[in-house]
A protein has these predicted regions:
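Core catalytic alpha/beta fold that binds nucleotide/phospho-ligands
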Residues: 1-117
């Protein structure tokens, strides 16, 4: 058994974010996404797809590690079209590999975490 590795997966309907418009639900979004994520997603006409993808990554991260962590302590970004994950305020240190895909009305994310000893 490999104790320092974890895997998380999450799938979400993009329409959940389409129905919950940012302009009308700012407090909801600010409880989940840090400023850099909000700024990134809101640049796009179809921001719901971006928000759903980032949410799926955050859920997958939470499932891949053993400690409880808040959404705002997980920050996602992109480098050359690949998701990057950073955690703030964690008892442990981790490396992450994340993958994200969108298809029709779904976003799915898979995250592999490695606890650094």
């Amino acid at each position: 058994m490999i104790e320092n590795l974890g895997v998380g997966i999450d799938i979400i309907e993009v329409s959940r974010f389409r129905r919950k418009k940012y302009e009308e639900n700012r407090n909801f979004y600010k409880k989940i996404f840090v400023k850099s994520e909000l700024d990134y997603c809101l640049k796009f006409k179809n921001s719901a797809e971006r928000f759903a993808g980032k949410f799926a990554i955050k859920e997958a991260v939470k499932k891949s590690i053993s400690e409880k962590i808040r959404f705002l302590d997980i920050e996602t970004s992109h480098l050359k079209s690949k998701p990057i994950v950073r955690i703030k305020k964690s008892r442990e240190k981790y490396n992450f590999i994340a993958s994200l895909s969108h298809e029709n009305d779904f976003a799915v994310a898979v995250v592999i975490s490695e606890k650094i000893k």
